[in-house]
A protein has these predicted regions:
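NAD-dependent ADP-ribosyltransferases
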Residues: 1-222
């Protein structure tokens, strides 16, 4: 694995390096975050969207006729039961500025970090550490065919719209319960202009303490 970057405030950087504090948040937190649209906030976090440019084609069962609907297809994972920790593959002044970061911490040995992460997660009985996934985010356009991705919650958790591609995100994701079970998603057709569902008031989070990480990190002042 290549080095990974996390953008922090000074206080949070100190907590990460000295105590190994890693805060996993539920996908629903980022879905409902309202303070910085297009940075941390993503109202479609945890949802795979398919919206073809020429309309969503469906076949009428009675007549066999194919028609194009203006609706979009949404497949949503269990957003309160999938916890993620987000980093970046790029040390960038632009990324730092957009996140309003004071410090960038470069994780020099991600494999050692991952081992510590697995060990800490294994102590949380509600989580499935054996199903922990970690990869660069796959960025996509809504017109792209969803293939089988719509039925796979762990793939949905690792995808974001291309408008976020500047973040070069690398994500760690772990499920609670059966959140990664195949087809454990809510699928619906959404008509144009339909109001967004009410936002959640509570968003689960998970604070891990991995111990001092200074030997596998480099701190960059911004």
């Amino acid at each position: 694995m290549t080095p990974l970057i996390r953008y922090f405030s000074k206080a949070n950087a100190q907590a990460f390096v000295e105590r190994g504090e890693v805060l996993f948040r539920a996908l629903s937190f980022f879905r409902d975050y309202e303070e910085d649209a297009g940075v941390r906030s993503d109202e479609h976090e945890g949802t795979l969207i398919h919206l073809p440019a020429d309309g969503l084609r469906v076949t009428l069962t009675k007549t066999g006729e194919s028609i194009a609907l203006p609706h979009r297809l949404e497949s949503t994972a269990k957003e309160d039961q999938i916890f993620v920790y987000c980093m970046s593959t790029e040390l960038s002044e632009n990324i730092a500025q957009r996140f309003k970061a004071e410090v960038a911490v470069e994780l020099l040995e991600p494999v050692k970090f991952l081992a510590k992460l697995r060990s800490a997660l294994s102590l949380r009985k509600s989580l499935h550490v054996n199903k922990l996934v970690h990869n660069p985010i796959r960025y996509y356009e809504w017109h792209e065919p969803p293939i089988v991705d719509w039925a796979l919650p762990e793939w949905i958790a690792m995808r974001k719209h291309k408008s976020f591609e500047w973040q070069k995100e690398y994500r760690f994701a772990v499920p609670a319960g059966d959140a990664f079970r195949v087809e454990n998603v809510s699928v619906r057709l959404v008509p144009p202009g339909q109001p967004r569902s009410p936002r959640s008031e509570a968003h689960p989070k998970l604070l891990l303490k991995l111990g001092n990480l200074s030997k596998i990190c480099r701190v960059h002042a911004l």
